Amino acid sequence: MTAKGNPLTNHQESLRGFPGFLQDVNQHVDRAIAQGMSTRSFVLQIAERYSYIRLADLYRPLRFLRQLSGQPPVCFGASGFRRDLVDDQEPARHYTAFVFVGYWLPTLLATPILWAWEILGFVRYGWQWSQPDIRSGTIGIRHGRCVRKQGPGVLPTLIARDLSEKVGSGPLDNG
């Protein structure tokens, strides 16, 4: 816990890559199911933990936007994530942000938000386009829609299937 008593602001958690992310999501799913937590509450919890989306800060837009583009409370690193989804050291952050967006909005509305966010990033980061972020965000939106329909229990399977670097998936492989 930090001095303010918020366990979510501990940036000192170890970087454990994809396996750590999947394990942490599994633990949150298990806890949500055991406690009878609503899917809505689960999504809010993981969005705050992995992407620093705190709806309580919406009334302070600059702080809210700084949090979105900053380091999340819990960090895992990029190891073990599909390489075509990684453009920085926190791919779980971007992915989870769009799980959040996909949960709340239909794909037809969520996709323009993804593109708008990436266009803003393109300008902010000196004309550097991130196709990995578009891919990751698209997967996140799709997973968010699935969580909305099927509940938190579906998320670990989707993450394992779609975000993990597969053995033998290098650029020289044929399949």
Where do the language-model regions lie?
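Intrinsically disordered, low-complexity, mixed-charge
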Residues: 1-175
